[in-house]
Amino acid sequence: MNKTSVPSIDSIDRQWYLVDAENQTLGRLATEVASVLRGKNKASFTPHLDTGDFVVVVNADKIRVSGNKPQQKLYRRHSGRPGGMKVETFTHLQERLPERIVEKAIKGMLPHNALGRQMFRKLKVYKGAEHPHAAQQPKPLQLDPAATAQ
């Protein structure tokens, strides 16, 4: 009888990937990136281990959503104080902090526990085309062509 092999933490080979978010649909980009962060693109995927790779997302300020979402999609946060609820539309948040839109979409697709927080730390999002991770030589990650907004 064959036994299932579980990769050790030392044997996990982490790659760096670069994703250009320009003219990409938010949800379709987020699902692909979340899958790579979890390690589901590897043969050594194990649900209870962080086998994922690092992902650098650039041009977060040029991400797209469909329909009326730019005016109707709301992002909520709370300061923890009474009356501390803040509500912002997609358009306003994109002008102020475009990285947060991509981060929030991807974080919601990762496990909601300590392992998910560890996976989320491997995500790096930047609003422009520049990023400080050139030394890691990130490879371009090919996304599904359907993810490109028309």
Curated annotation (Swiss-Prot):
Keyword Ribosomal protein: yes
GO biological process terms held by the UniProt record: negative regulation of translation; translation
Xref: InterPro entries: Ribosomal_uL13, Ribosomal_uL13_bac-type, Ribosomal_uL13_CS, Ribosomal_uL13_sf
Keywords: Ribonucleoprotein, Ribosomal protein
Stretches for region Disordered: 129-150
Cellular component per GO, a single term: cytosolic large ribosomal subunit
PANTHER family, A to Z: LARGE RIBOSOMAL SUBUNIT PROTEIN UL13M, RIBOSOMAL PROTEIN L13
Function noted in UniProt: This protein is one of the early assembly proteins of the 50S ribosomal subunit, although it is not seen to bind rRNA by itself. It is important during the early stages of 50S assembly.
Protein name: Large ribosomal subunit protein uL13
Organism: Synechococcus sp. (strain WH7803)
